[in-house]
């Protein structure tokens, strides 16, 4: 008897609009192949703040801050079939979205 599998997909992007579009594409593709989908679940946004001094020599009180936000989503596909895996491999995602896929036995 084989154990059931679960596919966990993590998406990361600096642009939340691209991230939402990609998550929607993945969910639609998985549902069209007959798999159960849980998500997309929004994960906490990472915020990195970088502070630099504006002047090249002195004036340490004059500073400027920049921030980079990394938005994340989690999608679980329960009991994926071979058809689901093949369809997900063919999905084209934008260049600004990082995807991490893990298969896990439940």
Swiss-Prot record:
MF terms in GO: structural constituent of ribosome; tRNA binding
Q: Name one GO cellular component term.
A: ribonucleoprotein complex
Q: Which InterPro entries match?
A: Ribosomal_uS10, Ribosomal_uS10_CS, Ribosomal_uS10_dom, Ribosomal_uS10_dom_sf
- GO biological process terms, semicolon-separated: translation
Q: Does the keyword Ribonucleoprotein apply?
A: yes
What UniProt keywords are attached to this protein's entry?
A: Ribonucleoprotein, Ribosomal protein
On whether Ribosomal protein is a keyword of this UniProt record, the answer is yes
- The record lists its disulfide bonds as none
Q: Which Pfam families match?
A: Ribosomal_S10
SUPFAM superfamilies according to UniProt:
Ribosomal protein S10
Tell me, what does this protein do in biology? Involved in the binding of tRNA to the ribosomes.
Task: Share what the entry says about its subunit structure, partners included.
Answer: Part of the 30S ribosomal subunit.
What is the protein name for this chain?
Small ribosomal subunit protein uS10
Look up and give the organism this protein is from: Caldicellulosiruptor bescii (strain ATCC BAA-1888 / DSM 6725 / KCTC 15123 / Z-1320)
């Amino acid at each position: 008897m084989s154990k059931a599998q679960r596919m966990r997909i993590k998406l990361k992007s600096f642009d939340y609009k691209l991230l939402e579009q990609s998550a929607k594409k993945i969910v639609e593709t998985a549902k069209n192949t007959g798999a159960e989908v849980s998500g997309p679940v929004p994960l906490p946004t990472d915020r990195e703040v970088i502070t630099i001094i504006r002047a090249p020599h002195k004036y340490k009180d004059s500073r400027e801050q920049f921030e980079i936000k990394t938005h994340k989503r989690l999608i679980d596909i329960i009991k994926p079939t071979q058809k689901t895996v093949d369809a997900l491999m063919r999905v084209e995602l934008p260049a600004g979205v990082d995807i991490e896929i893990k298969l896990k036995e439940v």
